[in-house]
Amino acid sequence: GPDYIDPMFHRTVIGVLSRNLDTFFTGEEQTRKLFLKDRGENDFAVIEGVMGLYDGLGGIRKEGSSYHLAEVTKTPIILVVDVKGMGRSMIPLIAGFLSYDKAHLIKGVILNRMSAMYYATMKPLIEEELPIKVVGYVPDMKDFALQSRHLGLVMPEEITGIREDLKRLTEEITKTVCVDEIVTIAEHAPVLNDVTDIQKIEPLKADGAGQPMI
């Protein structure tokens, strides 16, 4: 959806501009074309989902959800699951997401807020019972949390020491998440057709007004 705060964080973290993709505003074909155009000559494009994977319009429809966008762009999904305080119950939780995945787009799982010792136990158990790869975990880093306020996160430039914190977070995650495995998953993504003409959408204007509607 339309969001300006997340792109600011992306620019701060990886030093490149990111853009919004929204199947509600631009439809499936136009969204696919915009995705291909913005990807350019880069080897990989990373899409950050919003809300829950299947939460679309009104929170009750698939249209407009992160899953719908993945369908439109044929993007493999890495599902991040918050498992803090959970035991074996995380297996049926993941199984439920897989059963909803009619297009078989979920290709890997990352377990969030989990200890190294418990990960060593749960990873083989999950992979034994479910047809999915567990590609890593993120430890519960209590001293690292992004601040928030009404209507969302604070701006990245308002957070003291954000670059140092993100560097530390990156160093930690590269130890616990198999990035090479995620790259391999991305390399097997289906090929999309080349970009054709992108329809120019004029801004709406209120009746009798000369300025676009906001």
What would you call each of these model-derived segments?
Residues 43-44, 208-210:
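Nucleotide phosphate-binding/pyrophosphate-handling subdomain across enzymes
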Residues 77-80, 135-137:
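Short hydrophobic alpha-helical runs that function as membrane-insertion/retention elements
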